[in-house]
């Protein structure tokens, strides 16, 4: 059996009870943290909390050479961990299908995600979000500024009155950076303000799931000059706003009245 367990948003306590029980029952526990990570903890603390050993896999070890994971699942109960939910945004459906091809039973234990937190923390209605996009570091996509696909997605959503969830780039063990690199919301706002529309409304969500989670709404040009603290950050570019959403952004995110 191969069980996919989402760890939630922040630390070792963010996992669901069902996820915790699956980890406790597993013969072997694998994890990847190259797509995202739990900022409030580390692997050692996770191991101590769950009284287990976690075998960390890099991208190649999951996407190109998953045999150790699959072999463990064929021989017993294996668990595969990620931050957030294993099947949302960066999906591991390929690993699940490889297991199915080998006749290995699978199951998924879901967890809170950045997408659900963005709606819950900002007061924006979740069914009014359109297609999401990811804003990469300029050096990562090989050009200056913002890829056209990002602004095209935002504009297409806005034409339909929909909000855009903008995931911000994460680089783990990348040869261009020393350590891990996390795009901040102010960097993202600056890129969009410079290359798209400085007067457009943006909503920052910083450290969703943490005790000090922060939400701030303002024009992109103003957000570019702000400091939102430690990662992880994401950015929402709203479409048309329901009057309840306007009230929520004023009360929950400090949005200036003239920016709404």
Swiss-Prot record:
Keywords: Methyltransferase, S-adenosyl-L-methionine, Transferase
GO molecular function: diphthine synthase activity
Pathway participation: Protein modification; peptidyl-diphthamide biosynthesis
Name of the top EC class for this enzyme: transferase
Domain of life assignment: Archaea
Enzyme Commission designation: 2.1.1.98
One Pfam short name: TP_methylase
Binding site for S-adenosyl-L-methionine: 9, 85, 88, 113-114, 168, 208, 233
Coiled coil: none
GO biological process: methylation; protein histidyl modification to diphthamide
Catalyzed reactions: 2-[(3S)-amino-3-carboxypropyl]-L-histidyl-[translation elongation factor 2] + 3 S-adenosyl-L-methionine = diphthine-[translation elongation factor 2] + 3 S-adenosyl-L-homocysteine + 3 H(+)
Gene3D superfamilies: Cobalt-precorrin-4 Transmethylase, Domain 1, Methyltransferase, Cobalt-precorrin-4 Transmethylase, Domain 2
HAMAP family the UniProt entry points to: Diphthine_synth
Protein role: S-adenosyl-L-methionine-dependent methyltransferase that catalyzes the trimethylation of the amino group of the modified target histidine residue in translation elongation factor 2 (EF-2), to form an intermediate called diphthine. The three successive methylation reactions represent the second step of diphthamide biosynthesis.
NCBIfam families the record matches: dph5
Subunit and interaction comment: Homodimer.
Family the UniProt entry places it in: Belongs to the diphthine synthase family.
Name of this protein: Diphthine synthase
Organism of derivation: Halobacterium salinarum (strain ATCC 700922 / JCM 11081 / NRC-1) (Halobacterium halobium)
Lineage: Archaea, Methanobacteriati, Methanobacteriota, Stenosarchaea group, Halobacteria
């Amino acid at each position: 059996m191969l069980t996919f367990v989402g760890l939630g948003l922040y630390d070792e306590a963010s996992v669901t009870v069902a996820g915790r029980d699956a980890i406790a029952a597993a013969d072997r526990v694998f994890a990847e943290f190259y797509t995202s990570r739990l900022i409030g903890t580390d692997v050692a603390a996770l191991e101590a909390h769950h009284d287990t050993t976690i075998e960390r896999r890099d991208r190649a070890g999951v996407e190109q050479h998953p045999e150790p994971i699959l072999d463990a699942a064929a021989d017993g109960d294996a668990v595969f961990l990620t931050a957030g939910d294993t099947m949302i945004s960066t999906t591991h459906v390929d690993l699940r299908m490889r297991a199915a091809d080998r006749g290995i039973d699978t199951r998924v234990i879901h967890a809170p995600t950045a997408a659900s937190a963005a709606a819950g923390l900002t007061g924006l209605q979740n069914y009014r979000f359109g297609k999401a996009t990811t804003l990469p570091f300029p050096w990562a996509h090989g050009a200056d500024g913002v890829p056209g696909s990002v602004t095209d997605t935002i504009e297409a959503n806005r034409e339909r009155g929909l909000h855009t969830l903008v995931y911000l780039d994460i680089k783990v063990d990348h040869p261009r950076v020393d350590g891990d690199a996390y795009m901040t919301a102010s960097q993202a706002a600056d890129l969009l303000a410079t290359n798209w529309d400085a007067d457009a409304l943006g909503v920052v969500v910083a450290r969703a799931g943490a005790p000090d989670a922060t939400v701030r709404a303002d024009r992109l040009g103003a957000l570019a000059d702000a400091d939102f603290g430690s990662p992880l950050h994401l950015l929402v570019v709203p479409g048309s706003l329901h009057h309840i959403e306007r009230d929520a952004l004023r009360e929950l995110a400090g949005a200036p009245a003239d920016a709404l």
